[in-house]
């Protein structure tokens, strides 16, 4: 099995290390040709506006969209979830107008849990995965779903309230958090099970 990890900005190295620990071939995706013959794609956390601009500048948007529409699973973590969402607003600034792939029927609020200093670790329960330890760093909240998208897990937070932190639509997973920081393999195993189907 070959899993591509978008390697333009952000914490892609941590995802690659975990995939290799799981015995999966991980490939860096930096240009459209790197998407050939992969069984799944991870879009990592980082700065969503920067990653989106780099996706656009490197002409990766349409090839990624075609890949996902063809049935190849994708997992977006934190900034990756923002890029997968069809609707994006910022908790403070409102409408962002930022580039996004817009593949999932979800609406997200950027920085929903506060700024960098409001980062936190949590144990959450996700449908299909179970309990997992994860990190929230300037994370988005999933506040709306429609169509075939469904929320897999929620968190109760003093700033954001009760909000979704994971959503799935077919082979697409949007995660508000960073599973790679804690290294909880259950989330990766779930994603890899989608790639094996």
Report residues per predicted region.
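Short secondary-structure boundary/hinge segments and terminal tails
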Residues: 36-38, 85, 128
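Redox-cofactor binding/interface segments in oxidoreductases and associated redox assembly factors
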Residues: 43, 76, 175
């Amino acid at each position: 099995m070959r899993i591509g990890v978008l390697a333009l900005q952000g914490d892609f190295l941590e995802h690659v290390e975990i995939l290799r620990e799981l015995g999966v071939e991980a490939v860096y995706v930096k240009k459209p040709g790197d998407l050939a013959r992969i069984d799944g794609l991870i879009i990592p956390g980082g700065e969503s506006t920067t990653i989106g601009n780099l996706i656009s500048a490197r002409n990766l948007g349409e090839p990624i969209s075609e890949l996902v529409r063809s049935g190849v699973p994708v997992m977006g973590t934190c900034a990756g979830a923002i890029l997968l969402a069809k609707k994006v607003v910022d908790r403070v600034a409102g409408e962002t107008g930022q580039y996004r792939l817009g593949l999932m029927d979800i609406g997200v609020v950027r920085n929903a849990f506060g700024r960098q200093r409001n980062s936190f670790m949590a144990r959450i329960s996700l449908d299909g995965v179970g309990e997992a330890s994860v990190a929230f760093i300037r994370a988005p909240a999933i506040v709306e779903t429609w169509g075939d998208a469904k929320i897999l897990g929620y968190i109760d937070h003093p700033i954001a309230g009760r909000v979704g932190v994971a959503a799935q639509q077919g082979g697409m997973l949007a995660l508000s958090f960073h599973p790679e920081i804690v290294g909880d393999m259950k989330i990766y195993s779930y994603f890899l099970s989608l790639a094996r189907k």
